[in-house]
């Protein structure tokens, strides 16, 4: 029987005798089983085809994304992006210890940012020296041996009640007082930590209003926070240049007893410090200061550049930082890990607004004016700088001439400012007119607090998150004089374009310039030749310490 003849029929098969060939019951039953078998065969073939397709797809996926036990698939508070989905997030298998800068062994869940931040930025071209890595590991051992609660700490604490001490103790300390705005605090704390490394001291951090809410513990096995029962804590606010244990005051009034060793000294290194306070940066004075077991420091300065001008520190600094303009880049990434709450602010915003962009541009706007703004001359300055430096495209006001690009480049612009007007101005410009290049520009601003609120925890949490977000951009524009911008450029290893400070509310010409290095500026350096005991331009003594681009009298490493 021709089976195909039954499949080819277009008219129904009838069992009656009229009009069509009659078919008996046995033939009809045979046709039914043949049809049923054909349908089963078709379904089986289709199922196999689907299964094969799925297996091929899985094979391709796992070939592109090899399994890795160190890969972080996700987390509740601040999810790490999948590098296969978001190409602007660096390789998930990147070096989470930052070339040995960070120590292993921390509880990762207690501080997500410590090891996960590497996934959100490009690998740094600046590698820490083996000497710096060794120095940090040795410091961690010292901190664990001498930190709060240890027998050595308890023994040293008893010395505070004495006027003078006999002999050298096992451990010496430098206490950093929490003082000034967040940017200043971060920079000054990094400076004091470097001083601790150079002098084999243990750094203890006054938590102030919010230091423990903002930053994780950086040292394994021992807190860096000054205990709440430290006997001098209630004196911190009152310490100034006229305090009896202020080193500058003692030098000025010639009351230093060189025969004995003082139990403690107060070092006033705030921007308003005097010439006698600045003697701290003289090698002879460091010899005396180095014997004192307890140093209490109040500063709002990034005084690292002047440490390089102290001959006794020069060799050690050169070994620690062969690339001299990497000091804050390395120490900042070592010390300052945002707490999980702050890290959540960073990652949620990054994922929502920045992760899909082909290029990320950061613009940090700080206006030192009594009026809140926004100011037209500042908006003009931002546009002039970003367009002349080819960071952002110009707009074409003749819409009919706008370029059509099949796959336009997407740039995400992150604006941080106390005022919303500057971001809104950019957003409106790139919404109302097409770009001359066909690029798509998205403008985003996480917060607009209106004015600086130094003592508010949430304000500082947002500020830290924004500094960190700026550090994750590909290119950065910062404002002159701003420590906020200094922190971002240092953490990100970025040489920013600096918006020069306007005068008389007029847009500067040129509007901005490229920084010599990513290092912060020391705003209030000493101008004193310790040997000649006379004034001198300290920005011309060595080739790697120069005057800053944004503050002519400031010093920075280059």
Swiss-Prot record:
Topology versus the membrane: Single-pass type II membrane protein
Glycosylation sites: 88, 504
GO molecular function (one): galactoside 2-alpha-L-fucosyltransferase activity
Signal peptide: none
Tissue: Expressed in roots, stems, leaves, flowers, siliques and seedlings.
Cytoplasmic-side positions: 1-43
Subcellular location: Golgi apparatus, Golgi stack membrane; Golgi apparatus membrane
Keywords per UniProt: Cell wall biogenesis/degradation, Glycoprotein, Glycosyltransferase, Golgi apparatus, Membrane, Signal-anchor, Transferase, Transmembrane, Transmembrane helix
Its EC number(s): 2.4.1.-
Alphabetical list of InterPro entries matching this protein: XG_FTase
BP terms from Gene Ontology: cell wall biogenesis; cell wall organization; xyloglucan biosynthetic process
Residues that span the membrane, as ranges: 44-64
Ranges of the Lumenal topological domain: 65-558
Lyase is among the record's keywords: no
Top-level taxon: Eukaryota
GO cellular component terms, semicolon-separated: Golgi apparatus; Golgi cisterna membrane; Golgi medial cisterna; Golgi membrane
Role this protein plays: Involved in cell wall biosynthesis. Is both necessary and sufficient for the addition of the terminal fucosyl residue on xyloglucan side chains, but is not involved in the fucosylation of other cell wall components. Associates with other xyloglucan-synthesizing enzymes to form multiprotein complexes for xyloglucan synthesis in the Golgi.
Family: Belongs to the glycosyltransferase 37 family.
Subunit text: Homodimer. Interacts with MUR3, XLT2, XXT2 and XXT5.
Protein name: Galactoside 2-alpha-L-fucosyltransferase
Lineage of source species: Eukaryota, Viridiplantae, Streptophyta, Embryophyta, Tracheophyta
């Amino acid at each position: 029987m021709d089976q195909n003849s039954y499949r080819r029929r277009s008219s129904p098969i009838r069992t009656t005798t009229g009009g069509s060939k009659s078919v008996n019951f046995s033939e009809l039953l045979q046709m039914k089983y043949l049809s049923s078998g054909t349908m089963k065969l078709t379904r089986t073939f289709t199922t196999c085809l689907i299964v094969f397709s799925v297996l091929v797809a899985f094979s391709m996926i796992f070939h592109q994304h090899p399994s890795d036990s160190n890969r972080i698939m996700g987390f509740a508070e601040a999810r790490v992006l999948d590098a296969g989905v978001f190409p602007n997030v660096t390789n998930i298998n990147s070096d989470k210890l930052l070339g040995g800068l960070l120590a292993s062994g921390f509880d990762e869940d207690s501080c997500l940012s410590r090891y996960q931040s590497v996934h959100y930025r490009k690998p740094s071209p600046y590698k820490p020296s083996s000497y710096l890595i060794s120095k940090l590991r040795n410091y961690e051992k010292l901190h664990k041996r001498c930190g709060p609660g240890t027998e050595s700490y308890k023994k040293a604490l008893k010395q505070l009640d004495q006027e003078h001490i006999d002999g050298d103790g096992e451990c010496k300390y430098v206490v950093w007082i929490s003082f000034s705005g967040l940017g200043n605090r971060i920079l000054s704390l990094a400076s004091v930590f470097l001083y601790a490394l150079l002098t084999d001291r243990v750094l203890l951090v006054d938590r102030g209003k919010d230091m423990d809410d903002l930053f994780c513990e950086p040292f394994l096995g021992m807190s860096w926070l000054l205990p709440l029962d430290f006997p001098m804590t209630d004196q911190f606010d009152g310490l100034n240049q006229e305090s009896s244990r202020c080193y500058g005051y003692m030098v000025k009034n010639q009351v230093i007893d060189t025969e004995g060793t003082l139990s403690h000294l107060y070092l006033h290194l705030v921007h308003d410090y005097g010439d006698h306070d600045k003697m701290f940066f003289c090698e002879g004075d460091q010899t005396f200061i180095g014997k004192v077991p307890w140093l209490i420091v109040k500063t709002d300065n990034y005084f690292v550049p002047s440490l390089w001008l102290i001959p006794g520190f020069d060799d050690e600094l050169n070994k620690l930082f062969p690339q001299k303009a990497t000091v804050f880049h390395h120490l900042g990434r070592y010390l300052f890990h945002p707490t999980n709450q702050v890290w959540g602010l960073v990652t949620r915003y990054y994922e929502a607004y920045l992760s899909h962009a082909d290029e990320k541009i950061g613009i940090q706007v700080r206006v030192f004016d009594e009026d809140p703004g926004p100011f037209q001359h500042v908006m003009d300055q931002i546009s002039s700088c970003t367009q002349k430096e080819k960071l952002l495209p110009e707009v074409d006001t003749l819409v009919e001439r706008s370029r059509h690009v099949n796959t336009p480049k997407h740039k995400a612009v992150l604006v941080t400012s106390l005022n919303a007007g500057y971001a809104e101005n950019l957003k409106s410009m790139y919404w109302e007119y097409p770009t001359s290049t066909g690029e798509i520009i998205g403008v985003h601003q996480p917060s607009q607090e209106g004015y600086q609120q130094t003592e508010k925890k949430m304000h500082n949490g947002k500020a830290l998150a924004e500094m960190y977000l700026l550090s994750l951009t590909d290119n950065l524009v910062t404002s002159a004089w701003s420590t906020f911008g200094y922190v971002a450029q240092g953490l990100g290893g970025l040489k920013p374009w600096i918006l020069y400070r306007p005068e008389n509310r007029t847009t500067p010409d040129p509007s901005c310039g490229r920084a010599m290095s990513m290092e912060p500026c020391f705003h209030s350096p000493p101008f004193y030749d310790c040997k000649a005991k006379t004034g001198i331009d300290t920005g011309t003594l060595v080739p790697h310490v120069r005057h800053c681009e944004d503050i002519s009298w400031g010093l920075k490493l280059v």
